A protein has these predicted regions:
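Peripheral docking tails and interdomain loops at the edges
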Residues: 299-303, 307-310, 420-422, 442, ...
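Cofactor-binding active-site loop characterized by glycine-rich and histidine/acidic residues
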Residues: 24, 41-162, 316, 333-334, ...
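Non-catalytic terminal/interface segments that mediate subunit docking, oligomerization
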Residues: 65, 270, 278-392, 397-407, ...
Length: 618
């Protein structure tokens, strides 16, 4: 196999043209076979095999720097830098990351995970080159979807300031930019290379300027009218107006043509954008037909593309989806917002039933938050469904635009807590900390799927900013018989005991139930309380505990600093309440990728670890 010849970076440059043709097919087959076992991002990676090969043929790694936006499409890059053997442990605890990692390889120049950051990072690397006097190329690879993120436009606006070569590769896998231009754009792409286009444009302007009397007037007229004409035919005029030379579109399956254009781009003294057309899922039928299903795929059967492990129970996203549909039916003021995650957040069903009340704002969490604030100000009830790690990007808007005005915006925070295989950039372990410091913000977390429904109903009836956080994965269906009405800042008693009281929040209630059973086996009868609210929490319930308890244990799936337990501890100490407080929370660190249950055990927040800590504290 040709693939066996790739042991380290730049080995691809030793291959013949025939071997390159074989290599791209072997890489695709390897990715399909490997990801069918481990799970991972398949569709996006199948779409950029040739593009990645062309980049590795034209640039020298690790000297040259390639920044992968989001980074989930970097699998071929990992293979071409000698990490093929790592795919057997892809996204598993202690194994290879599914994203670029600077501590994994010198060829990964910048860690990524979230969208729309690559151009900013690339500009920083290119500017540092100018300051230090070093000599290397910088390439930022960004998808057309990531260009909907405002940060990308901020960087594009700043790109013209860069001194020296800076290449942006637009990986367009939806053809949304080019479909309106047709054959004329293909014709123009033949001469819009760096040298040819720049020389052609300069020669025309110079010639016109030398025409007596009328020449200068003609140049001015051309400059005043060119954009309106070119916008009809040339897809890259948006970038050119920002001072970025545009090359393309280029066929993303043609390695030779991409290499030709990349070599031209390398000669540009300034920012240049290469527009490459790719196809998600290329080479694997199921992924081509249903690319969204193979975005972050679970292990699947290659012949059919169907998951190997069929789900028998609903996950929290499914439950939220069902509840949102019901809320939409009952209240015409309920509207839904997503930042390009309609399927991932479960809002697709709401979209299908209430298209006029559904808003996809693109990858723009900050905008989505202030947009929601505007909707709320006008009397609607906006529900912004968003992953915990992505809501971090909207902190200022939550504080400044929503909470200062005390607006009724509902934040449905999915993937709160440990998410597992996507690793440190996606773990939702900070939201309680960054939301609880904001005045007027209410934070809830359900113990099971029924409470999620009850809390959403409470949130719609509430008047003010409110967040509901729930984890990734199967919705807990235990404790169905305990379903007290949701009241602001009121907890729920699950089990009465003595000596030790456990106040668990959200997903940790299930862990607490298991820990209580382990304690009972040791002769310890613990009180178990479902906290429900992280902020404001149930102070009255805490005040009553010293009568029969000496130890209060708080449990949460959030970092300790600024978390639920820390706020409770401060309250107990400040008010002189006769309780020792043991905080069970995640450590104040970034948590790597891995199975959630494995991570909980390693981080000592599983039931067995909690029980041992309680016994030691008593």
């Amino acid at each position: 196999m040709v693939l066996e010849k790739i042991q380290k970076e730049n080995d691809i440059k030793k291959l013949t043209h025939k071997e390159l043709e074989l290599l791209k097919d072997e890489i695709r087959q390897f990715l399909i076979e490997s990801i069918s076992v481990t799970g991972g991002h398949l569709a996006s990676n199948l779409g950029v095999v040739e593009l990645t090969m062309a980049l590795h043929l034209c640039f020298d790694l690790p000297k040259d720097k390639i920044v992968w936006d989001v980074g989930h499409q970097s699998y071929t890059h990992k293979i071409l830098t000698g990490r093929k053997d790592g795919f057997s442990s892809l996204r598993q605890y202690g194994g290879m990351s599914g994203f670029p990692k600077t501590d994994e390889s010198d060829c990964d120049c910048f860690n990524t995970g979230h969208s729309s950051t690559s151009i900013s990072a690339g500009l920083g690397l290119a500017t540092a080159r100018q300051v230090t006097g070093e000599d290397y190329h910088v390439v930022s690879v960004i998808g057309d979807g990531a260009l909907t993120g405002g940060m990308a436009y901020e960087a594009l606006n700043n790109a013209s300031s860069v001194k020296g070569n800076f290449i942006i590769v637009l990986n367009d896998n939806n053809m949304s930019i080019s479909e309106n231009v047709g054959g004329i754009s293909q014709y123009l792409s033949g001469f819009r290379t760096a040298d040819a286009y720049r020389d052609f444009k300069n020669n025309v302007m110079n010639s016109l300027n030398h025409i007596p009397i009328y020449g200068e007037r003609m140049v001015k007229h051309i400059r005043n009218t060119k954009s309106s004409i070119k916008q009809l035919f040339i897809p890259g005029m948006f970038f050119e107006e920002m001072g970025i030379i545009y090359l393309g579109p280029v066929d993303g399956s043609d390695i030779k043509e991409m290499c030709r254009v990349f070599d031209e781009a390398k000669r540009v003294d300034g920012p240049v954008l290469v527009h490459v057309l790719t196809k998600k899922g290329a080479g694997y039928g199921p992924a081509e037909r249903y690319p969204s299903r193979f975005h972050g795929a679970e292990p699947f059967v290659i012949e059919t593309g169907l998951p190997k492990n069929k789900r028998t129970k609903a996950n929290y996203t499914d439950v939220f989806s069902t509840v949102m549909k019901k809320l939409g039916e009952r209240n015409p003021k309920v509207v839904a917002i997503t930042a390009a995650m309609a399927d991932g957040t479960g809002l697709r069903r709401f979209h299908c039933n209430f298209p006029d009340r559904f808003f996809d704002v693109g990858i723009a969490e900050a905008h989505a938050t202030t947009f929601a604030a505007g909707l709320a100000k006008a009397g609607l009830i906006p529900v912004f469904a968003v992953y915990s790690s992505f809501l971090q990007r909207a902190f200022d808007q939550i504080l400044h635009d929503v909470c200062i005005q005390n607006l009724h915006v509902i934040f449905a925070i999915d993937r709160a807590g440990l998410v597992g295989s996507d690793g440190e950039t996606h773990q939702g372990i900070f939201d309680i900390s960054y939301l609880s410091v904001i005045p007027n913000m209410t934070i809830m977390a359900p113990k099971n799927k029924w409470e999620l429904s009850d809390m959403m109903k409470f949130a719609v009836a509430y008047d003010g900013p409110i967040a509901l956080r729930y984890p990734r994965g199967t919705a807990y269906d235990g404790l169905k018989e305990i379903r007290q009405p949701v009241e602001l800042a009121k907890s729920e008693l699950i089990k009465k005991g003595s000596r030790v009281a456990i106040m668990a929040l959200g997903s940790m209630v299930k862990t607490a139930v298991d820990a209580v059973k382990l304690l009972e086996a040791e002769g310890i009868s613990a009180t178990l309380i479902n906290a429900r609210f992280a902020m404001p929490f149930d102070k009255e319930a805490i005040k009553e505990l010293p009568a029969e308890h000496s130890l209060l244990v708080t449990m949460e799936e959030n970092v300790q600093s600024g978390g639920f337990g820390e706020h409770v501890t401060e309250y107990v100490k400040t008010n002189g309440i006769a309780l020792e407080v043991l905080t069970v929370a995640l450590p104040d660190c970034y948590v790597e990728h891995g199975n959630v249950e494995v991570l909980k055990k390693e981080l000592h927040v599983d039931a067995e670890s909690v029980a041992k800590r309680i016994i030691a504290a008593l």
